[in-house]
Amino acid sequence: MKIVACNSNRPLAEAVAAALNLPLTKASVRRFADMEVFVEIHENVRGEDVFVIQSTSYPANDNLMELLITLDALRRGSARRVTAVIPYFGYARQDRKSGPRTPISAKLVANLITEAGANRVLTMDLHAGQIQGFFDIPVDNLYAAPLFARDIAERFHGRDIMIVSPDVGGVLRARAIATRLNTDLAIIDKRRERAGVSEVMNVIGDVEGRDCILIDDICDSGGTLCNAAAALIANGAASASVYTTHGVLSGGAVARIASSPISMMTITDSILATEAVRLAQNVRQLTIAPLLAEAMRRISDESSVSSLFD
């Protein structure tokens, strides 16, 4: 097995390599004066089982091109199999037509990754599970649920907790954690009664006096989760915390979270933390490196990945 790290999240790639007791394959990603990307693999990969680690997070287009060009370099270098390890799959929120004459960008990205030379994909908490069907190659979608459930059990031991989905679409994700913890599930139903009227958040479930934990896959601007936390507190919750897999946290998200009722937001290191995230008092990271490493080992050994979540 060989591991190639692109530039979007090198610390995560190094942690994965360390967990597998393997060195990173020597490779370089450079940019010409006009910002074209040039990738060079400095070791022989002929006949090797190669894993390329690259999140397609901000800047999404640059990181996507790095991944595509690296895949092409490995394919042309006669690697036996190339797995694109994409902890955060950018463009996943564009998984359907949002209106007339609009693209399905997630499908386009899937096509590009396949055509560039990937033989399989390993990713984490896809925004929409059906994206796996956009690929004509195998896709292993890992879940943060076991990691989050263990952390919640440790941090909230002995407290009266309730798992909360911030919207109807996230119920299955939240229920998976509630089931692991044998606790109750609440749902926030967002409704706009008529045009021009502010969105109303209705809490379905009795959260009075309970420590509520919101579960989501992506936190971008933070607006939805901050509003959801405020709704929980307004309905009598003792506290509101958040667990979300992918901390995109764009723009003023960190400042928005800091001034919100969210007592603590827990994210994973699927996306490289910005300085604002590292300095934030109420944002913390859990590493997914051991989970990725074990999944990669199983793929290389041709053993079951799904049994990680049994």
Curated annotation (Swiss-Prot):
Residues reported to bind Mg(2+) 2: D167
Source superkingdom: Bacteria
Keyword Metal-binding: yes
Record's subcellular location: Cytoplasm
Binding-site residues, D-ribose 5-phosphate: R192, D216, D220, S221, G222, G223, T224
Enzyme Commission number: 2.7.6.1
Required cofactor(s): Mg(2+)
Cellular-component GO terms for this entry: cytoplasm; ribose phosphate diphosphokinase complex
Record carries keyword Magnesium: yes
Matches recorded under SMART domains: Pribosyltran_N (SM01400)
Key words, A-Z: ATP-binding, Cytoplasm, Kinase, Magnesium, Metal-binding, Nucleotide biosynthesis, Nucleotide-binding, Transferase
Stretches of the chain forming a coiled coil according to its record: none
Active site: K190
HAMAP family: RibP_PPkinase_B (MF_00583_B)
Subunit-structure text: Homohexamer.
Protein name: Ribose-phosphate pyrophosphokinase
The species this protein was found in: Granulibacter bethesdensis (strain ATCC BAA-1260 / CGDNIH1)
Originating gene: prs
